[in-house]
Amino acid sequence: MKIQLKSKDEIEKLRYACQLAAEVLDMITEHVKAGVSTKYLDDLCFQHITEVQKATPANIGYRGYEKTICASINQVICHGIPSDDKILKDGDIMNIDVTVKKDGWHGDTSKMFLIGKSEPHNQRLVKVTQECLYLGINEVKPGARLGNIGAAIQSLSLIHISEPTRLAS
């Protein structure tokens, strides 16, 4: 699959939507701490997107999903559903995934958080995962194939982790 190139105008609209999504993660960072529910974080993100950014939380309504963010804790790899029952604890690893829709364009991003004091192996996991992300991003360029991104990530992850997670083709 070849990556489709966008016009300069399309890139600017896309970039703006992505900036809004990144801004949500910046805003929520100070609230991500032990004792907080993922539902509380979801509510804060909803309020910020709709009231401050005058945008739409793109996840809401997608295939019946009713939340603003995905909040994945520890062994939940992705798309965890925020809940009043999911309370962050010291030592947790959490990923928040947010998608903002503005003027028809989607900005989608996520951020990994270490809650409180984390074990060294958790810190290493987050560090290696981020390195893999940047290596994959480096593969994105005109004419590149999407498989190149996965191959780059896999090559680095195999150095650090004995069995990387693989998605079914």
Which residues does each PLM region occupy?
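Short, compositionally biased
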Residues: 107-123
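Acidic/histidine-enriched ion/cofactor-binding microenvironments in catalytic or ligand-binding pockets
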Residues: 2-3, 7, 72-105
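Generic N-terminal segment detector
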Residues: 1-63
